[in-house]
A protein has these predicted regions:
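A charged, aromatic-enriched C-terminal amphipathic alpha-helix characteristic of glycosyltransferases
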Residues: 329, 349-379
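Conserved acidic donor-binding segment of nucleotide-sugar-dependent glycosyltransferases
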Residues: 319-320, 324-331, 338-350
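Nucleotide-activated donor-binding/catalytic signature segment of Leloir-type glycosyltransferases, i.e.
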Residues: 250-272
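Active-site donor-binding segments of glycosyltransferases and PAPS-dependent sulfotransferases
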Residues: 26-94
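Short alpha-helical donor nucleotide-sugar binding micro-motif in glycosyltransferases
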Residues: 275-280, 374
């Protein structure tokens, strides 16, 4: 069976690209189609033939392919997939609208329908600059139409969480299998990690005192709500380590001033990230994610999660065993959750029991389990 693998753009190694790399392992002889590809920024695809759409040939097409998202429905339809029996797309909007025959099977692993034109439009619009706001207003209906239309080319949807499955049902009117993304649980479960952290530029070393700080890890983008984690810890006088970069970093650093309890480390190596997880009191996860790999990584390292009880985290954290949820999407809600975590009695004080529960839960999200469940979902009738 000749197979084609599709991904919207391959220009960085983030969560969606890690899923796609796992699909590449599953289908080592498959050809890859994408709107833009940077071979030096994406790993795991060197053995595959990679074909780009015309988007890559446009000005800045490889550097900022998202600027051409409005053209991607047309680019997707022009991909020549006639020779393939099975088409597997890894998708959040602008690649699944392909042209296919009725005897070709198209399975879409959906990270989410286009959040920025559907239920998260307001959040993305608020965070966009003037040009972005204008583009969103102009192209929203256009992209909604093509997102709905492109779903017609899919024979089987596979969602990355129950949260996304519900969104697929609400927007596309389609049922989905649920297969959680693969997480490198074995790496983060390895208990041999250091006790200090070096910033990405190598300039500073910050000691990690086990159990003395909370951790935020992820991009510093508005919808992930790092501001809530920072403000809650400032209000409560708690130590917080922030790992990750993004547009909000400068603003967040200014907001804390000379508060020595809040440390921004920027991007760090995987080894440092593992140490950060393993030595944290708990991970703070105040955003709504489609799935959210970070909480699983933290649990693999034996660290519990304090999270807003919405989104994919409902699939990955066991309340009362590997973390706790709060319902009010405010700084006050997070402060209350942190207080509840700290006064929760022996439940969270028995570190070895909590760590064992976290690691056992994280094992459910291994790459091996992902590949096994994907094989079942991709099979006809799956």
């Amino acid at each position: 069976m000749k197979t084609a693998l599709l991904h919207y753009w391959l220009t960085n190694m983030r969560g969606g690209e890690k899923v796609f790399a796992a699909l590449g392992e599953m289908f080592p002889a498959a050809d890859v189609f994408t709107h833009a590809y940077k071979a030096d920024r994406v790993t795991g695809l060197s053995s595959h033939v990679v074909r780009e759409s015309f988007i890559a040939r446009l000005p800045m097409g490889r550097r900022r392919p998202q600027a051409y998202v409005w053209l991607m429905p047309y680019a997707s339809r022009r991909l020549d997939l006639r020779e393939y029996d099975l088409i597997v797309s890894s998708e959040s909007g602008p690649i699944k609208g392909i042209t296919k025959r009725s005897d070709q099977r198209h399975v879409c692993y959906c990270h989410s329908p286009m959040r920025y034109v559907w239920d998260m439009y307001d959040q993305y619009y608020a965070a966009a600059g003037l040009g972005g706001k204008l583009a969103m207003k102009i192209f929203r209906r256009h992209l909604q139409y093509h997102d709905l239309k492109s779903a017609e080319a899919v024979d089987q949807f596979v969602a990355n969480s129950r949260f996304v499955a519900a969104r697929i049902k609400r927007i596309y009117g389609r049922d989905s299998a649920v297969v959680h993304p693969p997480v490198e649980v074995e790496f983060f479960s390895d208990e041999t990690c250091g006790t200090e952290c070096r910033a990405h530029d190598g300039a500073s070393i910050i000691p990690f005192e086990a159990g003395s700080y909370y951790l935020y890890s992820g991009e510093l983008r508005a919808y992930k709500r790092p501001d809530m984690a920072v403000e809650a810890c400032v209000r409560m006088g708690k130590k917080l380590v922030v790992i990750g970069n993004g547009k909000m970093r400068e603003k967040l650093e200014k907001s804390v001033g000379r508060n020595n309890n809040i440390k921004f480390l920027g991007r760090v190596s995987d080894e440092v990230l593992k140490a950060a997880y393993a030595n944290a009191k708990a991970l703070l996860f105040p955003g709504v994610e489609d799935f959210g790999i970070v909480p699983v990584e933290a649990q693999a390292a034996g660290t519990p999660v304090v999270a807003l009880g919405k989104g994919g985290v409902l699939d990955s954290v066991i309340p009362g065993e590997t973390g706790l949820f709060y319902e009010e999407e405010t700084v006050e809600g997070l402060c209350g959750a942190i207080e509840g975590f700290e006064v929760g009695g022996g439940r969270w004080n028995d570190c070895s029991v909590v760590a064992a529960a976290c690691r056992a839960n994280a094992a459910n999200f291994s790459k091996e389990r992902f590949l096994s469940h994907m094989r079942l979902s991709i099979a006809p009738g799956g």
